[in-house]
Amino acid sequence: MTNSEQERWSRVKGRLRSTVGEDVYTSWFARMDLEAVQDESVHLSVPTRFLKSWIQAHYAERVLSAWQAEMPEVHRIDLSVRTAMRCATPAKEAPAAVEARRPERSDAKPVSDARAPVMTPVAASHDALGGSPLDPRLTFASFVVGRANTLAHAAARQVADGRRGDPVMFNPLYIHAGVGLGKTHLLQAVTWAGNAGGERKVLYLTAEKFMYGFVAALKSQTALAFKEALRGIDVLVIDDLQFLQGKSTQAEFCHTLNALIDAGRQVVIAADRPPSDLESLDDRVRSRLAGGLVVEMATLGEDLRLGILKSRVAAARAHHASFDVPEAVLDYLARSITHNGRDLEGAINRLLAHSKLNNQPVTLDMAEREVRDLVRPQEPKRIKIEDIQRVVARQYNVSRSDLLSSRRTANVVRPRQVAMYLAKTLTLRSLPEIGRRFGGRDHTTVLHAVRKIEALVGKDVALNDEVESLKRQLQD
């Protein structure tokens, strides 16, 4: 992909983000890659069939419109699934930083490489309980630990090191974070390490794979065998739970979750938001998920970003011994690329490709030129309703449980109304969702509170100052 194509793709992604909103973009478009631009066609790829089918069904016209705004001659968008590869065991040496990603093609031919581990494409008809594909690079050895992920790493390591029959400490272990912050890496590391001893059955499934497996079992009248096989697992690892759809599928997931936990089997789950924010899930499932250990992996700090960059350079050197990135370049990348770990890895891949293909050393000027589309303005902090409740409760000297209660005393009613007002103005949550998060209140109650505070801040200077102070505390 040329620099001009990279810049166009960056602008198209910006249009999509502004059109559909940050939450929708993160859920459905963040993992979409540009593969090629040919004449009147644009070739894009996503990692799963589920993402492909959902985008084609719901967002095809918007994607085409975003491209036509950039290139009016484009009349066709081809969306494919990046080929998933399965490896028998993770590579023992440092994992390769550069790996070709190609969309699925009927005419694709295998490429032999004596240094690479033997891999076989995962067949579409593979049994659901064969698990989702594992990336041999995603092990504990290649995971970079920092302040943002220390607790998540420690909890995942504790699960991986357990033995059959050991008491289960955290069940379920629920890890949530934004795109590219290491959730999938940790879950696959648990799976690799847990299966290494051969004592336990550790199964890694994406939510999409669970859904398709359950639906296929229903159609083939093998649902009972599907349930029994799942409940015979020692450690069940589920990734991208936010994509779990359908009442019957969610009900089966809830039954499986309960059966495994009640039997003392470990469940590990990852999603892009906390259980309370998974609005599409049944209340029983959210409650069960929240009953375990819920861990957030925070945004990567600069020190952690620098550690990830150094790790990726070391991995690249395993296959390209002469590859070198000066400290000044690493410092620049760590300061400038703040979005997620995938962008950091992509930056190293670009520098490696440019250095090798042009036979040039990596310099700061080259880095600034090659990664400029990855350097984004600092995004505003994402504020959560729990943060609002905590800060408001502290400001007005009440408890969070008071805000959620049915108490109608003056010292509770006003803080509750302020908190609802802030939830409406500082988050993207709907009125019904805000009401549910404030003790199961009706959306009309929330609307009344919002209008009440809106009217008061215009004429009550003291209240306006309090609200502005709360906003600053939440945004800092």
From Swiss-Prot:
SUPFAM superfamilies: P-loop containing nucleoside triphosphate hydrolases, TrpR-like
Annotated segments matching region Domain IV, binds dsDNA: 356-476
PROSITE patterns given in the database record: DNAA (PS01008)
GO molecular function: ATP binding; ATP hydrolysis activity; DNA replication origin binding; lipid binding
Main localization, broad class: cytoplasm
Region of interest (Domain II), residue spans: 73-132
Gene3D superfamilies: 1.10.1750.10, 1.10.8.60, 3.30.300.180, P-loop containing nucleotide triphosphate hydrolases (3.40.50.300)
Entry superkingdom: Bacteria
Biased composition (Basic and acidic residues): 99-112
Subunit structure: Oligomerizes as a right-handed, spiral filament on DNA at oriC.
Function of the protein: Plays an essential role in the initiation and regulation of chromosomal replication. ATP-DnaA binds to the origin of replication (oriC) to initiate formation of the DNA replication initiation complex once per cell cycle. Binds the DnaA box (a 9 base pair repeat at the origin) and separates the double-stranded (ds)DNA. Forms a right-handed helical filament on oriC DNA; dsDNA binds to the exterior of the filament while single-stranded (ss)DNA is stabiized in the filament's interior.
HAMAP family named in the record: DnaA_bact
Family: Belongs to the DnaA family.
Protein's name in the database: Chromosomal replication initiator protein DnaA
Taxonomic classification: Bacteria, Pseudomonadati, Pseudomonadota, Alphaproteobacteria, Hyphomicrobiales
Gene encoding the protein: dnaA
